[in-house]
Amino acid sequence: VQAGTKSKRNILDILKSTIEFKGTYPYPVHRIDKETTGVLIVAKNRKYAQLFTSLFRIRKIHKTYLCIALGKLNKDKGTFIDELFHYEGDRKIKTKAITHFKVLDTNNNYSLLKLNPQTGRKHQLRKQLLIHGCPVLGDNKYKIINRKTNKKNLLMLHAYKINFSIADSKYSFSAEIPFSFKNILKEKYLKIS
């Protein structure tokens, strides 16, 4: 959502200039890493921003990610439960991170994974995959040194789908898999079944 250290524009600036947000202010409801592609919920007013924030807090919004990872996991499906660390000033803070995973395909030393985070920690999926020996392909921050990457060094993590319910109505939004992601799938002989 925010601009990176080398970029002056962010998604909010871009949205403000669109017809959909004319006369309103976009309220980001959650974060997505700047290199990650896919679905992002942005509310058009404070009321809905607060509603979606509360749905996230009580874990009523479910996100699905697709990821191309380096390596293979020990199981075809399961749950990662890890303690992640970050710093607030000089204090080291420990937080619990939970992610459900399913291996969709593997070939050589690459895996196509479906990831469903139960918690929403900063860089959670990237950190957990590194902990479990399968870093995200193209991740320059959370990587195993001297491991292969892709030619364009793009992060192969895609926020594929978001599901939630409001007042007994179910909603599901998905983002098409980017061309760059499809190319790497083809290059690594991985298939989404």
Located regions from the model:
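RNA pseudouridine synthases
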Residues: V1-S193
